[in-house]
């Protein structure tokens, strides 16, 4: 069966052969990622979501279970929603500013994760996703409310910091779905570097 962002909150992109990879991108350098990888991600999102007018990438994170090339940041092992509805509104206001933020909230907006392997196919710890059309609101529980740093949990861009800047802190609510009959779950087996998921 096909899945779509509008129906399932999931879309699979294939044939991304022009995405920059190592050594063109230094995955240990935020500057390299932002200047080399971000434009390609923005272009891929605009192509996949044809009526998107603005794409703003507010952060990135690199998940892996080794200490190289970036600090230990293993995949999450529980099902979760990175943004609840109120947290999504706060994100838009925080990152888009006092003029554009409220204006964007008057129309349609989305927070979309662009997930792709960085070093070959993924065979361990694949990302599992439930179709949002099959998860009821009553099956979602708020499980963390906290003041996060730039990247949440006091960790800008997935890297630990000794002391987060209080000016950069804000409340962020996450959700956790409980399994229920009728939910449809997916994972992409062996997702490769020319594929990505919009979540």
PLM region descriptions:
Residues 1-65:
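N-terminal auxiliary "cap/dimerization" subdomain that precedes the catalytic jelly-roll/cupin core
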Residues 78, 83-192:
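Active-site environment of non-heme Fe oxygenases that use a 2-His-1-carboxylate facial triad
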């Amino acid at each position: 069966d096909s899945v779509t962002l509008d129906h399932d909150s999931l879309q699979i992109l294939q044939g991304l052969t022009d995405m920059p990879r190592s050594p063109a991108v230094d995955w240990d350098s935020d500057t390299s990622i932002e200047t080399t990888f971000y434009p390609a991600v923005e272009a891929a999102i605009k192509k996949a979501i044809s009526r998107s007018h603005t794409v703003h990438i507010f952060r990135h994170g690199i998940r892996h279970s080794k200490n190289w090339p970036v600090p230990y940041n293993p995949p999450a092992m529980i099902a979760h929603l990175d943004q609840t509805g109120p947290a999504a509104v706060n994100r838009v206001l925080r990152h888009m500013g006092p003029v554009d933020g409220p204006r964007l909230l008057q129309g349609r907006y989305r927070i979309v994760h662009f997930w792709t392997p960085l070093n070959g196919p993924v065979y361990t710890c694949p990302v599992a996703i439930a179709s949002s059309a099959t998860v009821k609101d009553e099956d979602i529980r708020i499980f963390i409310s906290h003041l996060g740093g730039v990247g949440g949990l006091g960790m800008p861009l997935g890297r630990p910091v000794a002391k987060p800047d209080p000016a950069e802190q804000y409340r962020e609510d996450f959700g956790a779905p409980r399994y229920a009959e009728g939910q449809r779950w997916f994972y992409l087996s062996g997702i490769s570097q020319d594929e990505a998921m919009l979540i």
